[in-house]
Amino acid sequence: MRKKIVGIVFSVSLLLTSVITIGTISLPKSENILLSGSSLQVEVITGGLGLTAILRNTGKENLTQINWDITCNGGLVILGKKTTGTIPLLRGDSSEIIKVPLIIGFGKTSITVTAQAAEGDDAIKTNQANLLGIFLKILPGDAGALTATIQKIMQGLRSPTVITNAGDQSNRLIIGEQTGKIFIYKNGSRLTTPFLDLSTKMVKLSKIYDERGLLGLTFHPDYENNGRFFVYYSAPSSDPNLNCDSILAEYQVSSENPDVADSSSEKILVRIGEPEMNHKGGQLAFGPDGYLYVGVGDGGGAGDQHGTIGNGQNISTILGKILRLDVDTGTPYGIPSDNPFVGQEGLDEIYAYGFRNPYRFSFDRESGRLFVADVGQDLWEELDIVINGGNYGWRIMEGNHPYDPALATTLNISLESLQYPIFEYSHDVGHSIIGGYLYQGSSSPDAVGSYVFGDWSTGFLKPGGKLYYLQENTSGVWHRFEFNLIKDRPLNRFILGFGEDESGELYMLTSWATGSLLPSGEVWSIKIE
């Protein structure tokens, strides 16, 4: 029997010792992580007061007696020129954080972290940094990494959340603000009249910080002929016990003007009751199969505490899921026959589950793989390749690490049955992963096959977004690199999103404010070399 979702509740927490160790565990691997043997990696270096590095064992086997050192070369280093230590045991698929509590000096220095295990595995990473007394500032980029040239093409937006294209050979970019206004960028400038304005339909947003608003926008694969597009936004709820409703709606372009939508054409497909202000998800994208995929968060609040088992693992609720809908059949939509819970317990709309806040996802243009960035809770951000029927662990797991493992016992779920991230990073690196795209454009051949993404910011008080990419080696292990930026200048922005034009070239959304009070939002083109 068809199990239709009606008014279901949902809600982005976007969003002095020498050695500190956290989160060291050993876990079984899922089918979408292909590892062979042990592999030691140095994943990240962060500065400030002292320096932090993360050592990771990406293999299945434990590593022992990992000797590490952190060395500063260049500049005037008064204290902390070289620090060494030993980690007795680093289990398979685990990581440990090492810290130098204080470095004092002046000038530009090269920071090198090396590590070697008794088994022979070793790793090295070098970053450039500026020393100013006791403060160490890590410069953007990794040694040997690709360089990203970013060019501002639009400004004056209020918290832009979405940038996409219509796929209609018009070469336009369509940008959505969190406030509900959607604009067109055409022939090098933004059109004055909004393509669509949803602001009067939406819940009243906090202008300082909010995770509600216009969160999703995508165009039908045959938009050039049928003029259909879809939005995901936050609206007031009639239920006083709920924070708001998330609305998935369909619209039509105006029959008279291709740069303006028909505002009277709204057809609501799904209305989701939201208990909290955060974890809204909202990403919309059509897959290579022609179906509409929808990202839905876990209902918000900390720790997925709604209901007895939370929402991520509850297949009777829409919350904490990736949905797959057939918007070309049915009323108001149809269900693909191979959705995993068709004909059995669980909602028919569900494609995959066990997510906290799948805020951004995208499909690889070549392989069709679905890359989902799931925003973490306290410690870890993750990137998943999502498959039909996959359980991605939340709240049993946060990334590769136990969060509430007792829930697996309660639900009779084995850890071996879960799907684990292809990559994760700790909150020492950043606070909220912003999913991007596997680059398949033509203007940056060196970047083809690299997954370009970002982190919202290293902190909430000062904008500190980071621009990254992942590369996959022959054994299926993904390595993270920070792009080098021209003139070593940090972004000094919050990263809000990424998008593609019709040719597969990439764009980035940023703001230097956390909310929509000021028109501080910007659009940047990205060229990689």
What are the residue ranges of the model-derived segments?
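Secretory targeting signatures
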Residues: 1-35, 68, 113-115, 135
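Surface-exposed loop and turn segments in beta-propeller and other repeat-based domains
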Residues: 193-209, 264-280, 329-351, 395-428, ...
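Terminal connector regions
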Residues: 79, 103-136
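Short acidic/proline- and small/hydrophobic-mixed sequence motifs that coincide with surface turns
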Residues: 61-65
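Intrinsically disordered, low-complexity Pro/Gly/Ser/Thr-rich segments with frequent PxxP/GP/PP motifs
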Residues: 77-106
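Acidic, Gly/Ser/Thr-rich repeat motifs that build Ca2+-stabilized beta-propeller blades
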Residues: 138-301, 360-363, 368-376, 429-474, ...
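Conserved blade-ending motifs and adjacent loop-strand segments that build the rim/top face
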Residues: 477-502
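Asparagine-centered strand-capping/turn motif at beta-strand->loop junctions
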Residues: 55-59
